[in-house]
Amino acid sequence: FPELCHGCGGCLLACEEDALVEVEREIGTIRRGAGFMDGVLDVGEAKAPPLIEGLLREVAADPGQEGALVLIDAPPGTSCSAVAVVRGADYVILVTEPTPFGLHDLKLAVGMCQALDRPVGVVINRCDIGDQETASWLRGASIPILEEVPFLPEVAAAYANGELAAKSVPTLSASLARVARAITEWQ
């Protein structure tokens, strides 16, 4: 049942008879570019954590990354893939929206980060579309709000035009600069 394997090695630890053998199997590719790395899962593969962990090992082994700020984009939620990324992080930025569903998922993600003993900061995206429950909960939990980004129709327009919104929408650029400053100050 190779499609069920998460690559964690748990079955090897559990098997007292040493009847299992670990076999390497390619599940994707790690690509390198100028200042950028990503992992691409092969079509039909469902388990990303081993690829993510391989990517994190490559980043850690890259001498050019020594002391550098490395940003790793993770999938949303608390899936195995998200856990694999957060486990290797020094600091986690969670992005949420001020809706009941957003707050529910944020609480789960914060709980995961706390269980992994990782510090967290939050960006509230489209901060003007919902209520203040999310911001209130974050303040009560003493979790820093790094930025509150309003709903910006120009962002959708920029994407529709094939533009990089961070460069073509000044309000978004300023918000991202404030998040970058918060990360730098945390370091």
Describe the residue ranges of each PLM region.
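Short, surface-exposed connector motifs at secondary-structure boundaries
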Residues: E66, A89-I93, Q114-G121
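Iron-sulfur cluster-binding cysteine motifs and their immediate structural context
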Residues: F1, H6, G10-E26
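Switch II (G3) loop of P-loop NTPases
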Residues: D38-K47, G54-A82
